[in-house]
Amino acid sequence: KSIIYSTETAFGGKQLTEEIQQHYNLSWSDAGRAKRKGGLSDDYGQVMLEPFKHSLIKHIDKAMKIFYSSSESIVISKLVLSGGVSKLDGLADDIASALSIPAEVGDVLKHLTVNNAIDANSFADEGPAMMLALGLALSESR
């Protein structure tokens, strides 16, 4: 199996951070930290996160429709999510359910050996966010 189509959307963690920043009147760094570590009000999931997930699913659905309109015989068998926002709890399951296609969080770092000087857990947490950078680095080395 190989990757036959890849697309990048300009909708993701940055937009969620901006929405958190505006809604809760936080600085950019505080909003980003709250997004990653929690600590927002109890209504965060319903007021911020669920609408964000719904919008993200709409973006993915649109990208899939564009792909299918240009390819008659190829079927998408799985979505691999990347970027920091892909680690949101339940996002892959929500996408799979809404779009009726398997979805998973990609993690290119899980196959790498980590130097002992690096905190392996912190490194592993960044896997989905590093997919594009590592892919570009590997393509340059060929």
Where are these predicted regions, by residue range?
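Hydrophobic/aromatic-enriched cytosolic interaction surfaces used to assemble or bind macromolecules
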Residues: 1-142
